[in-house]
Amino acid sequence: RPYLQTTYEASPLNRPVAQHGVGEAWVEHPVSYQYITRDPRSFSWLYYKIPSGNFLGVCTTDEDGNPAYEFKDGLGRTILAGRMDGSDPYFVYYQYNNHDDLVNVYPPFVTYPKMHEPEGPFDTQSSYSYRYDFLHRCVYKKLPERDAIYYIYDHGDHQVFSQDGEQRVRGEWAFSLSDELNRPVLTGICHNSYYYDDFPLCEIDVKARRDDTGTAFHGYIPENIPMTNPVVYTAVSYTHLRA
């Protein structure tokens, strides 16, 4: 059979319930979909500020009969995803803030604060954490077993600075500057003193202006921002074609 066959449910939602792969070998081994709802309070092993009401879930069973689950809330956001191994859950838990930004991701078997418990020494080293500014731009990113990375944006929505854990120890910021046409032209490090949560450049447009006298920046001069002990890693020049 040289075609893919999809079977849909008999409802106005027209959701797929089975999909048979190409070839006779898959006639009796389709990928099947089962749509379910579940109250989050029934998850005794996962109960941290989960919104009230039912999750909309889909159980996807592959050709070998292995089921995987994904549950979404009423806003279409994935809250739980994973599979069961007997009675053991292997689920990833996604947490959002009031602005629909993803703020925490807890992999399977990671300890996290439960409802009515104070914040404490939970296993944040094995989870993912994100923070955002008032424009929903990520300013803080924490990956498992890594120090957090900070990001600073200017008024023009450019990510100008970033800083990982090792750079923080050395007092360094990595910078990336664009020209007046928003083309990236300069990258490097500097020793400016910033705190990402203060949004220090939110009202400043940072540019790199072409100027052959700007020897420290290889033909550019940063505008509207001082640079402390800068070291340039890359400098890009663009040609100007005339008609």
Model feature map: region roles:
Residues 1-242:
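Beta-strand elements of repeat-based all-beta scaffolds
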